[in-house]
């Protein structure tokens, strides 16, 4: 039964039938084409014939008579035991709609797809003979076996020719292609179906497919009398299924996101390897999808067809070497969105039955699109305000932004899952074009696809535009038009393009135009592949719009989020501790151990009277020691759970600082031990070659193509470079400071023994366990500890300065990054006292001059990495102390002198 093309919805209990003065359910002859217009944002409403007209009077009489007969026959059903809420059964509603629509078509002389040839011919003959029988006795025969599902050409007024094979298939099936709105009928099993219950498992609510070896049972079931309407109707539940798709959001926390194993299931089916249950539980414990193959599934005994379907779907988007061949295959089987007539191709070794069996094996609930409302929920404003990791990271990153997580292994898996989903959608559209009666509402991916498109749009556009969105993106109507061949996707894409350009940033306009052109190309070239590409672009644009909105909200709300960042984190962890969801015992034991070690080592100024500032200093030292490469820690304390990734990156920066200082120490040793230089020459060489220049040149040598620093593998290159720099600066000084003469091409004069010594020394001292490395690392840690303690100004009651919250502001140039902590910053925002970085007393050389003395051997203040590490540690340690400092002091008890508090 064709669903009436009106958006008024099905007849409700309070309004069982339209009145004679307002027959809005019957379309007029002038609007029989029912075209979508890209310039209109809403669908056209039906034109109602006047009661005074002959057609209108006949329709009114027919409707009244039909309703009267239905009421007399008592063939009605009530809801909630109320006798007033009357809904006609399927047979009555079928007869009522068919009579009304055929009478209008008879008067207009136009044959619509909902009429049969016999009915239209009889109606025309009766009308021309002037037979004005009573409307109550009017019986228009409707031959449901010869229902036409051809494409109607709106320009010529004729139906387009269709394949005889398709006509024979549709004539044999004798079923509708889509169920009525808000209800569905089990096509293959017309037995009574009770309403689904929320307590039943999903498999129980899904229609059971009959075995392929018993076609006589299906024919016998189709010949049964209609009976009561409740035996044929099943009301859909309005409850939305939860989406188990992978979230596509990544922020600076580098938080691990869970993913489902649908891709691995497909691979296991393809390779015929069962998934080990232990691994499945361990890796995919959050997955709630049912497996593809069930014990009661008719395909479980012979999965060959399903494997071939999966292989074909993956092959379409697989190797780049077969892209040209795949395009030819897809184009040969493509569809025209105006004609919806798919051509069969001899290139396919996959039969239509294999495709149908693959669709029937779809698990329930049906998978959602890769970009769905559940995955985008994380970036809603309410979720942003409740996200503790984001509230923590925003302190360190002023330009914190959401972006799609397509990096690394998770990104590759996400792309593979998306390709599988869209290939399945492409397969469904192809099958439904050949066999529309195969469509099942609860097993089609098209239903959640259109629902997700509408739901995501409703979260983006203003509330006043919601009725328009619901009207245009009517899922059931769009699917019905898609199955009948009347859905013009180019018009729908044009409407979406106008809507996107109106609400998204202008920089997204080229992307929107690309999406619209994809649909136009699909219609022009009859390409199903381009149609799927256009649908993918639609969802990608929706995701980008949601991300833009979320990033704008974060940027606007950042000052407010920073103002109560400490209080929010305090409340968050106190709530977890009170509910016993977080156990701090191990963390408290860790701090107590560090406290005892510092007291035993004599690192406390007055062990007999330890104050709260002393405890704060121990906290600084304990956290900094977690960054040591000599004593690598595998786990961090629970209070530092939000800073795991940040601490790992800080440890890499610490190693880079120490290795640069090792190279600087080697450079000064080579200069000091060179007998060919006098004192003035040595001072000139050391003064000219600054630590910053040394760092830039060495980093360019040791960095590989992936951006990783390889110190131990490039010791020979570093040794040659340092010897070459010393030789060049020596000749430059001898030539009265002329760089041009020193850099003239000359024969190499490097000493091989010096290069060998430098290489051997670097290979040993760049190892974290070497003594020189340990001395330099401790020196860096001591400088960081003193700088943080002096700036914090910890009071006697343990309060520290709260300026760390606003340390990273864009107006100071302190722009953070989500992937690296080594960023260029403004040195004026964090000023380090020169006394903290004074030259080492154990230096092998004693340079003269104020500039050389202020730089010295351990002049780490010239390194941007040191400034970056200092800022991050200053904010991290003070935030940690503000939240967990009271717990540490309470745990120490009488060990701390609390006088004056």
Curated annotation (Swiss-Prot):
GO BP term, pick one: cAMP/PKA signal transduction
Location, primary (coarse class): nucleus
Region (Disordered): 1-87, 106-139, 162-231
Subcellular location: Nucleus
PTM sites of type Phosphoserine: 40, 53, 191, 193, 245
Gene Ontology cellular component annotations, sorted alphabetically: nucleus
Biased composition annotated in UniProt, kind: Low complexity: 10-51, 116-138
Pfam families: Tcp11
Disulfide bonds: none
Keywords for this protein: Nucleus, Phosphoprotein
Bias-annotated ranges (Polar residues): 74-87, 106-115, 220-231
Source species, domain of life: Eukaryota
Function, as annotated: High copy suppressor of a cyclic AMP-dependent protein kinase mutant.
Family membership noted in the UniProt record: Belongs to the TCP11 family.
Protein name according to UniProt: Protein SOK1
């Amino acid at each position: 039964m064709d669903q009436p093309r009106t958006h008024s919805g099905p007849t409700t209990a309070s309004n069982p039938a339209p009145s004679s003065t307002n027959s809005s359910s019957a379309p007029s002859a002038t609007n029989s084409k029912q075209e979508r217009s890209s310039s209109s944002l809403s669908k056209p409403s039906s034109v109602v014939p006047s009661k005074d007209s002959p057609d209108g009077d006949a329709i009114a009489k027919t409707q009244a008579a039909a309703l009267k007969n239905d009421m007399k026959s008592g063939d009605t059903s009530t809801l909630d035991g109320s006798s007033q809420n009357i809904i006609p059964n399927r047979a009555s509603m079928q007869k009522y709609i068919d009579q009304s629509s055929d009478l209008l078509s008879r008067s207009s002389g136009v044959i619509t797809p909902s009429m049969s040839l016999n009915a239209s011919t009889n109606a025309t003959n009766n009308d021309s003979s002037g037979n004005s029988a009573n409307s109550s006795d009017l019986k228009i025969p409707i031959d449901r076996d010869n229902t036409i599902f051809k494409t109607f050409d709106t320009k010529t007024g004729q139906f387009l020719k269709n394949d005889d094979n398709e006509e024979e298939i549709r004539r044999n099936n004798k079923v509708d292609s889509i169920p009525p709105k808000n209800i569905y009928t089990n096509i293959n099993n017309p037995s009574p179906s009770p309403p689904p219950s929320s307590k039943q498992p999903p498999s129980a609510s899904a229609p059971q497919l009959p075995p392929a070896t018993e076609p006589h049972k299906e024919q016998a079931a189709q010949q049964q009398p209609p009976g009561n309407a409740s035996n044929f109707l099943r009301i859909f539940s309005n409850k939305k299924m939860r989406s188990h798709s992978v979230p596509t959001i990544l922020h600076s926390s580098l938080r691990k996101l869970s993913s489902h194993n649908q891709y691995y299931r497909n691979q296991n089916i393809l390779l015929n390897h069962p998934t080990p249950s232990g691994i499945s539980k361990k890796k995919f414990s959050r997955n709630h999808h049912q497996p593809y193959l069930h014990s009661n599934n008719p395909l479980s005994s012979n999965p060959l067809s399903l494997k071939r379907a999966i292989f074909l779907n993956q092959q379409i988007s697989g190797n780049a070497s077969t892209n040209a061949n795949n395009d030819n295959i897809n184009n040969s089987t493509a569809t025209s969105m105006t004609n919806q007539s798919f051509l069969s191709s001899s290139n396919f070794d996959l039969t239509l039955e294999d495709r149908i069996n693959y669709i029937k094996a779809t698990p329930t609930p049906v998978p959602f699109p890769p970009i769905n409302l559940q995955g985008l929920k994380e970036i809603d404003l309410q979720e942003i305000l409740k996200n503790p990791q984001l509230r923590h990271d925003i302190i360190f990153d002023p330009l914190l932004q959401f972006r799609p997580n397509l990096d690394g292994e998770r990104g590759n898996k996400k792309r593979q899952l998306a390709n599988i989903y869209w290939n399945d959608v492409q397969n469904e559209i192809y099958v439904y074009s050949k066999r529309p009666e195969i469509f099942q509402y609860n097993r089609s991916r098209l239903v959640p696809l259109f629902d997700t498109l509408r739901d995501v749009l409703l979260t983006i556009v203003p509330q006043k535009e919601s009725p328009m969105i619901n009207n245009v993106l009517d899922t059931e109507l769009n699917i019905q038009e898609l199955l009948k061949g009347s859905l013009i996707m180019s018009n729908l894409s044009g409407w979406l393009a106008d809507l996107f350009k109106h609400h998204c940033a202008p920089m997204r306009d080229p992307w929107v135009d690309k999406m619209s052109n994809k649909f136009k190309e699909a219609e022009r070239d009859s390409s199903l592949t381009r149609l799927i590409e256009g649908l993918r672009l639609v969802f990608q644009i929706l995701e980008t719009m949601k991300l833009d909105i979320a990033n704008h909200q974060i940027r606007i709300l950042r000052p407010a989020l920073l103002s109560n960042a400490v209080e929010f984190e305090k409340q968050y962890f106190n709530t977890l501790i009170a509910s016993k969801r977080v156990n701090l015992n191990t963390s408290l034991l860790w701090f107590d151990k560090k406290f005892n070690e510092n007291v035993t080592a004599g690192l406390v100024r007055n062990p007999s009277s330890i104050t709260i500032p002393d405890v704060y200093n121990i906290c600084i030292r304990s956290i900094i020691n977690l960054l040591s490469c000599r004593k690598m820690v595998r786990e961090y304390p629970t209070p530092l759970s939000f800073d795991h990734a940040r601490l790992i990156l800080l440890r890499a920066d610490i190693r880079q600082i120490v290795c640069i200082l090792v190279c600087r120490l080697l450079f000064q040793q080579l200069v000091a031990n060179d007998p060919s230089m006098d004192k003035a020459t040595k001072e000139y060489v050391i003064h000219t070659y600054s630590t910053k220049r040394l760092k830039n040149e060495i980093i360019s040598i040791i960095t590989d193509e992936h951006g990783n620093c390889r110190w131990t593998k490039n010791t020979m290159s570093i040794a040659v470079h340092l010897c070459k720099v010393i030789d060049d600066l020596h000749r430059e000084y001898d030539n009265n400071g002329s760089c041009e003469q020193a850099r003239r091409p000359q024969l190499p004069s490097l000493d091989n023994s010096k290069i060998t010594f430098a290489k051997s020394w670097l290979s040993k001292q760049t190892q974290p366990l070497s003594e020189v490395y340990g001395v330099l690392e401790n020196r860096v840690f001591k400088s960081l500890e003193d700088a943080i303690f002096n700036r914090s100004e910890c009071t006697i009651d343990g309060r520290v300065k709260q300026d760390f919250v606003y340390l990273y502001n864009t107006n100071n140039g302190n722009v953070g990054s989500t992937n690296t902590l080594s960023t260029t910053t403004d040195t004026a925002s964090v000023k380090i006292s020169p006394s903290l970085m004074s030259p080492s007393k154990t230096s092998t050389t004693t340079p003269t001059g104020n500039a050389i003395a202020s730089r010295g051997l351990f002049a780490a203040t010239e390194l941007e990495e040191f400034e970056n590490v200092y800022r991050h540690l200053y904010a991290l340690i003070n935030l940690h102390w503000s939240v967990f400092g009271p717990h540490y002091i309470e745990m120490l008890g009488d060990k701390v002198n609390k006088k004056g508090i």
